[in-house]
Amino acid sequence: LADYKGQVVLLNIWGTFCLPCRDEMPAIEKLNQAMAPKGLRVVAVSIDEPGAEAKIRSFAKEFGLTFQILYNPSGAMENAYQTTGVPETFVIARDGVIRKKVIGASDWNSDGNRALIAQLLAERGR
């Protein structure tokens, strides 16, 4: 994620096996479509077991996902962000500070979430 330094990032940790993850993906894609042109970077990190690459590709195709999807079966991402399950999502400001953390599914395309992201996009790095 160091590649995204200085950018506003929505980091979603998920798995193909997770029903709430399936529920929230369409809203994440809608948010991405609306806010990526303004500078938001959406990164979804799958924590599926080793060997799940085809499953992950199929999931992304099924939902028409256009944002970056990473695969981290080692557990390093869960350790780094001290997650307790999936989905778990972080909104990270340009300065690298986590501004919002949500455990469980959320409507990421809601007015409140879009307003937060718009505010963070308007802020310049500190």
Positions of predicted regions on the chain:
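Structural microenvironment flanking redox-active thiols in thiol-disulfide oxidoreductases
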Residues: 22-63, 73-80
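Non-globular targeting/processing and membrane-anchoring segments
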Residues: 124-126
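Aromatic-flanked redox-active Cys/Sec active sites in thiol-based oxidoreductases
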Residues: 12-18, 47
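Thiol/disulfide oxidoreductase modules built on the thioredoxin-like
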Residues: 58-66, 71-119
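Short amphipathic alpha-helical/adjacent loop interface patches that line ligand
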Residues: 8, 25-28, 114
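A short beta-strand-turn-helix
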Residues: 1-9
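Conserved hydrophobic packing residues within short motifs/helices of P-loop NTPase cores
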Residues: 9-11, 43-45, 90
